[in-house]
Amino acid sequence: MSRVSQARNLGKYFLLIDNMLVVLGFFVVFPLISIRFVDQMGWAAVMVGIALGLRQFIQQGLGIFGGAIADRFGAKPMIVTGMLMRAAGFATMGIAHEPWLLWFSCLLSGLGGTLFDPPRSALVVKLIRPQQRCRFFSLLMMQDSAGAVIGALLGSWLLQYDFRLVCATGAVLFVLCAAFNAWLLPAWKLSTVRTPVREGMTRVMRDKRFVTYVLTLAGYYMLAVQVMLMLPIMVNDVAGAPSAVKWMYAIEACLSLTLLYPIARWSEKHFRLEHRLMAGLLIMSLSMMPVGMVSGLQQLFTLICLFYIGSIIAEPARETLSALLADARARGSYMGFSRLGLAIGGAIGYIGGGWLFDLGKSAHQPELPWMMLGIIGIFTFLALGWQFSQKRATRRLLERDA
């Protein structure tokens, strides 16, 4: 086996272990933020939405800067520093009793993510061959789902005792992850050339095809981020107990572990990437619309199942498209900018979703935020369809990934 092949094989295992630690650390804390501050402390949902939206916007919106710096200096220092900042953010969150302190903790957490997320994504593109990426992204999503359930179960159990224990556990996991990267991650370059920070950013901004694709996905992310805000609140309201939230993540894990990889393998042989992305988005949008009208937990979990199935179809295709469009000369910059849609959509989804949720509750129209999200998803579906229908874009970008 050549040294390059050996590095790729070892790199796959490293990426999987690293991803599991990151997912566990994240999901121990973040799914419970809305329960802690809205349900237990009585804050308005929009206050928590601002905190979550701030973290999302900082982490993803500044991702191009983190990616460009990683292109220049390498992945390792950025990843280790970012994970330690995330740990500091979680530690601060544990003592948050005022909105400004929660916002500050989410700011720290987001800045940490800005540093470690783009180089981690670029490492996947660097180490995984193009024809294997869709399947590897599917494996990562399966791992994400399993880690989300384990993390949410652990966090829910710890929340019975003290929210500070929840945050401390998340912080410790990110410190361990930082140590793991500091010890084992080689000093790999992310790009084929050592691209100056400004040049990498300029290269991305001039790529209008990539910029259009990324910005269009903002609507997709407005729906996707509700698994952290409105869906847990809705499950808690219908069930009458925060412990039911863990079953929402258990559903995601069961569906992902049983369906994600088979669907990815089958669909890559029969459908283009853009068709899979659009089909998943349409299912997500339609499943959102009736959520505010259900009164039973069984009905709610059925709609959540449909939402997750849509995500299972769409997410590997979205990740693979982003990697396919990235210029090898500035991988970090491209993967950083690819998060801008998540930054915009996530911030609007969290803040706007929290505001609409409060508005719908006060106006006795609980279906309002869910119908609006469904409409946004359908408009995004139409926008993607228009974008991918352009002959030039289709010919240049969207080959089958099999």
Swiss-Prot record:
GO molecular function: transmembrane transporter activity
Compartments where found: Cell inner membrane
Keyword field: Cell inner membrane, Cell membrane, Membrane, Transmembrane, Transmembrane helix, Transport
GO (cellular component) term, any one: plasma membrane
Membrane topology: Multi-pass membrane protein
Annotated PROSITE patterns: MFS
UniProt-listed Pfam families: MFS_1
Intervals, Cytoplasmic compartment: 1-12, 117-138, 186-213, 265-276, 321-339, 389-402
Keyword Ribosomal protein: no
SUPFAM superfamilies for this protein: MFS general substrate transporter (SSF103473)
Gene3D superfamilies: MFS general substrate transporter like domains
Disulfide links within the chain: none
Residues spanning the membrane: 13-33, 99-116, 139-159, 165-185, 214-234, 244-264, 277-297, 300-320, 340-360, 368-388
InterPro entries: MFS, MFS_dom, MFS_trans_sf, MFS_Transporters, Multidrug-R_MdtH
Residue numbers on the Periplasmic membrane side: 34-98, 160-164, 235-243, 298-299, 361-367
Family: Belongs to the major facilitator superfamily. DHA1 family. MdtH (TC 2.A.1.2.21) subfamily.
Matching NCBIfam families: PRK11646.1 (NF008650)
Name of the protein described by the UniProt record: Multidrug resistance protein MdtH
Organism: Shigella sonnei (strain Ss046)
Gene of this entry: mdtH
